[in-house]
Swiss-Prot record:
Gene3D superfamilies (alphabetical): 2.60.120.970, Cystine-knot cytokines
Binding partners and assembly: Homodimer; disulfide-linked. Interacts with WFIKKN2, leading to inhibit its activity. Interacts with FSTL3.
Site (Cleavage): R98, D99
Keyword Lipoprotein annotated: no
Organism listed in the record: Antilocapra americana (Pronghorn)
Keywords, comma-separated and alphabetical: Cleavage on pair of basic residues, Cytokine, Disulfide bond, Glycoprotein, Growth factor, Heparin-binding, Secreted, Signal
Lineage: Eukaryota, Metazoa, Chordata, Craniata, Vertebrata
Gene Ontology biological process: myoblast migration involved in skeletal muscle regeneration; negative regulation of myoblast proliferation; negative regulation of satellite cell differentiation; negative regulation of skeletal muscle satellite cell proliferation; positive regulation of lamellipodium assembly; positive regulation of macrophage chemotaxis
Name listed for the protein in its UniProt record: Growth/differentiation factor 8
Leader sequence segment: 1-18
Functional summary from the UniProt entry: Acts specifically as a negative regulator of skeletal muscle growth.
Propiece residue ranges: 19-266
Length: 375
């Protein structure tokens, strides 16, 4: 009993020396600590966002197999961009992001872009294949995007100038060949007859899939084609070499190639906004603006929602590998902590100019963060 009294006396003496406890001070310190934590989280998210934007630039160039961004001016784009139905449909009905679940988790995506449509503009043929020293329209060069994919569709698009009176137009597509003994330089590909009424000019498409497939099998046979569209008076209405005011009316090839479907896989994760106080791993919104990059060579989309992952990954939040939580409990010093990373990503469709001034419509995988998790 005497010992207990001594202990109580010592305890009371310590309280007197220490003075009264300020509960408000402790509360203020806690509040300041929380504010500091939130500021640090905001700063971390801002750094993560900046890093994500820079990574997207690098990824796009890499996935499109471009060493640098194509140097194409806005004026050049206006001249090269065809004013044609298939391109307008791609832009008007543009599907920037697919919300379906057909594209699965990150590990199921291929790295490089999948080409779906290639729009190839004509180039001038070399002197050896020109007839009588004059370039004949049109010569098309094909990139590996066409050569190493299955061609599903190939259409030659030509623009016919307007007529003043109703007339019948005879369209003929000729393939340039090596000179034969009788001097023949052409062989027919397709011919058709169509009626035109007064008014605006029209775009006409012609199936050239068989010819394209032959060219891909035997590239040396690709010497070019000639286009004729004669009215009843023998006037050629086809725009092969555009005159002033005819920008965007060049002939071109629209080639569609096969795409490979991907497997799907569902995942779960948190969604947050920029004002969220969530400290755990979460998906945050991020819009990529290609015009802000100065990337005029991307026709569409001009911007898209990429999103990014940020937040803490304590082992209790671990989603992808639950067994790691048990490992950490057994050996907390010997196991590395999880990171907040994308666990599900989806592609974007993109319409762009490549380095050869060809218009490509394709799918770039793993460009949109759909889910974030700790792994």
């Amino acid at each position: 009993m005497q010992k207990l009294q001594i202990y109580v006396y010592i305890y009371l003496s310590m309280l007197i020396v220490a003075g009264p406890v300020d509960l408000n001070e402790n509360s203020e310190q806690k509040e300041n600590g929380e504010k500091e934590g939130l500021c640090n989280a905001c700063l971390w998210r801002q750094n993560t966002k900046s890093s994500r934007l820079e990574a997207i630039k690098i990824q796009i160039l890499s996935k499109l197999r471009l060493e640098t961004a194509p140097n194409i001016s806005k004026d050049a784009i206006r001249q090269l961009l065809p004013k044609a139905p298939p391109l307008r449909e791609l832009i008007d009905q543009y599907d920037v992001q697919r919300d379906d679940s057909s594209d699965g988790s990150l590990e199921d995506d291929d790295y490089h872009a999948t080409t779906e449509t290639v729009i190839t503009m004509p180039t001038e043929s070399d002197l050896l294949t020109q007839v009588e020293g004059k370039p004949k329209c049109c010569f098309f060069q094909f990139s590996s995007k066409i050569q190493y994919n299955k061609v599903v569709k190939a259409q030659l698009w030509i623009y016919l100038r307007p007529v003043k009176t109703p007339t019948t137009v005879f369209v003929q597509i000729l393939r340039l060949i090596k000179p034969m003994k009788d001097g023949t330089r052409y062989t027919g590909i397709r011919s058709l007859k169509l009626d035109m009424n007064p008014g605006a000019g029209i775009w006409q498409s012609i199936d050239v899939k068989t010819v394209l497939q032959n060219w891909l099998k035997q590239p040396e046979s690709n010497l070019g084609i000639e286009i004729k569209a004669l009215d009843e008076n023998g006037h050629d209405l086809a725009v092969t070499f555009p005159e002033p005011g005819e920008d965007g009316l060049n002939p071109f090839l629209e080639v569609k190639v096969a795409d490979t479907p991907k497997r799907s896989r569902r995942d779960f994760g948190l969604d947050c906004d920029e004002h969220s106080t969530e400290s755990r791993c979460c998906r945050y919104p991020l819009t990529v603006d290609f015009e802000a990059f100065g990337w005029d060579w991307i026709i569409a989309p001009k911007r898209y929602k990429a999103n990014y992952c940020s937040g803490e990954c304590e082992f209790v939040f671990l989603q992808k590998y639950p067994h790691t939580h048990l490992v950490h409990q057994a050996n907390p010093r010997g196991s590395a902590g999880p990171c907040c990373t994308p666990t599900k990503m989806s592609p974007i469709n993109m319409l762009y100019f490549n380095g050869k001034e060809q218009i490509i419509y394709g799918k770039i995988p793993a460009m949109v963060v759909d889910r974030c998790g700790c792994s």
